Amino acid sequence: MKIGVLGKITKVKSQQVIDELVEFLRSLGYETQMFTAPQEIQGVDVVIVLGGDGAILHSAVPAARNNVKIIGINYGNLGFLTE
């Protein structure tokens, strides 16, 4: 299974979390790919989106076009969609 990871890497803490998540997934034997923008989502079975509701919403259309499932992890303020 190929897993993509998408999150805002403009913050140092976010980059650290993304790096740790990718390392963990690879240690379990998953092929991983990091994305920096929703438009890049393709070539994976699932994308893990770290962010708030806006990140999930922006990722929905590109993911759907490429038949990619979304797993959301709330890293924002509201988190309604990741609840």
Residue ranges and their predicted role:
Residues 36-83:
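Small-residue-rich beta-alpha loop regions that form the catalytic core of phosphotransfer
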Residues 1-46, 50, 58:
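ATP/NTP phosphate-donor binding region
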